[in-house]
Amino acid sequence: MAPSEKDIEEVSVPGVLAPRDDVRVLKTRIAKLLGTSPDTFPGSQPVSFSKKHLQALKEKNYFVCEKSDGIRCLLYMTEHPRYENRPSVYLFDRKMNFYHVEKIFYPVENDKSGKKYHVDTLLDGELVLDIYPGGKKQLRYLVFDCLACDGIVYMSRLLDKRLGIFAKSIQKPLDEYTKTHMRETAIFPFLTSLKKMELGHGILKLFNEVIPRLRHGNDGLIFTCTETPYVSGTDQSLLKWKPKEMNTIDFMLKLEFAQPEEGDIDYSAMPEFQLGVWEGRNMYSFFAFMYVDEKEWEKLKSFNVPLSERIVECYLDDENRWRFLRFRDDKRDANHISTVKSVLQSIEDGVSKEDLLKEMPIIREAYYNRKKPSVTKRKLDETSNDDAPAIKKVAKESEKEI
């Protein structure tokens, strides 16, 4: 059975692409703030869930949330690169495309004047498009992590501390501002809220209550370890679970048309659809062919856009054929060969929904055994959980319409 073909193109990043000189300044600021490379996307990347990760859920504490079908973006609050004392908000994707978002404001906690603004604040989240009965659409930015706030980097802190900082310093002031400035916030290009999370053993609630009520696409679950720091790049403790039929790979598509002995190439005839995997730098290697039937070929041609040398997301059908799902123009490169191997391993060694639910009582018992009072646990609470209560309060508020 094919996954739901919700076109990612339906969700577009709001704002205007920043000029090259501004982007250079923004990249430098972020790199200096985080201690990372200016040309590397600083966001974390999950690994595919396999059977071995069931043990990880038993040994460590995790939060779990639904995996939204949207556009992954980091949100950066700063001062405009060229104008002093002008607050600016930018969204940037994995390609390091920076979009200047206007007509949005994130107030500072306890600022009655409304003149203060956040600088060097970096959030991790995803843009999703909620569709309501009657056709109303609402763009949302769902936050699932906080890398830095007002120049202080929190990547080395634990997840509940990072989320607590977002809840206390950003979400709470925003909610209060919204109540008193309804006219101004009504024109915000998107709503901002904390992504709803459950304890690692709470997936039954996600499957039965949360996911069925979503107004945007979903293609799995994300398990985030609460005991580890935020990692730029691949994070082995950040787990991406998908049903087998939703395990997809992003390839580089290349069309190879038959070369006639005489005359011109017939570009309307069906070509070979070659799928390439990324080997690093600018190197790609052939991986497999993509199966396309006549009906699908006609649909692809009807797009009337170049098809070759584009990133395509593919799934493996019941006959082990790679099939087209959608274009991934939000990505600069196809999946790296290491990621491809990980996804294939996940498909081969996959964990079904039933497998997850079967293990949940054991994972839950292990979690509460770890919660038994100990000196170590109390010290950990004192150093990292001081903002945890704010998470629950704001998470509850974030479920309401802003």
Swiss-Prot record:
* Top-rank taxon, per record: Eukaryota
Q: What class of enzyme is it?
A: transferase
The reaction(s) catalysed by this protein are:
a 5'-end diphospho-ribonucleoside in mRNA + GTP + H(+) = a 5'-end (5'-triphosphoguanosine)-ribonucleoside in mRNA + diphosphate
Q: Which CDD domains match?
A: Adenylation_mRNA_capping (cd07895)
Q: What is this protein called?
A: mRNA-capping enzyme subunit alpha
Q: Which GO terms describe its biological process?
A: 7-methylguanosine mRNA capping
**One of the Pfam families matching this protein, by short name:** mRNA_cap_C
User: Keywords on this record?
Assistant: GTP-binding, mRNA capping, mRNA processing, Nucleotide-binding, Nucleotidyltransferase, Nucleus, Transferase
User: Which residues of this protein are catalytic?
Assistant: 67
**What are the subcellular locations of this protein?**
Nucleus
EC number(s) given by UniProt: 2.7.7.50
The family database entries (InterPro entries) matched by this protein are listed as:
mRNA_cap_enzyme_adenylation, mRNA_cap_enzyme_alpha, mRNA_cap_enzyme_C, mRNA_Capping_Enz/RNA_Phosphat, NA-bd_OB-fold
User: So where does this one cross the membrane?
Assistant: none
Organismal lineage = Eukaryota, Fungi, Dikarya, Ascomycota, Taphrinomycotina
**Molecular function via GO:** ATP binding; GTP binding; mRNA guanylyltransferase activity; RNA polymerase II C-terminal domain binding
What Gene Ontology terms describe where this protein resides (cellular component)? nucleus
* Positions of the UniProt region annotated as Disordered: 374-402
Function statement: Second step of mRNA capping. Transfer of the GMP moiety of GTP to the 5'-end of RNA via an enzyme-GMP covalent reaction intermediate.
